[in-house]
Amino acid sequence: LLFMVPSGLRIYHSERLFLAEDTRTQCYDWITKNIAYGSAIALDATGPVFPRLKQTKELVEESFSNFNNPKFATPEGSMSYKVKLLLSNPDYPEDTYRILYLRKKISRKNRFLGLYPESLLDMDELRRQGIEYVVAHNILLSSYYKDFLEQLEEGSVLVKEFSPYKPGRGRIKPLEESSLAAAPFSFRELSDRERPGPVLRIYRLR
């Protein structure tokens, strides 16, 4: 029976996390309750772990018109059809934001409409684009982007943080890369968490 204890504990912690609210959901709910609709928000797109806020229809149209991928820009292209369906949806929410996506570099070849328009990791560029808030997750908050993080913390105010970890753990980045977009597997990562999701911080630019 003793050999079953580790597996049992792992299952217990996994089930406990699955029943808890994800930090991305917490972040989404906080933003919609505390940040005015129509505000300009830069979402950290250095990884696939950001809250799915709704883009304004105007920016969806503008993004598609500027989306220079001939394969999808043709009248019969799948992207064109998708955008038309999206914009004609009578249930498209009115409570939307001006969303830009933070990238380390902007590629003109491998682009996705769902991550457009883009903005570089540069504070001057963010101000030029009228960004009011930045939502950063644990990849951007790690030492890999130290230079930009220092600029961000100097030029903004931290207004809210959402952490999946128990108090006192003091960790930002997970122990395993698979935890960035899915559930953790290692026992330590499971037991250290209160909920699924990444560390997320909301900054208000000065």
Regions inferred by a protein language model and the residue ranges of each:
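Signature aromatic-anchored transmembrane alpha helix within multi-pass, membrane-resident enzymes
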Residues: 1-10
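C-terminal luminal/periplasmic domains and tails of membrane-associated envelope-modifying transferases
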Residues: 10-16, 23-206
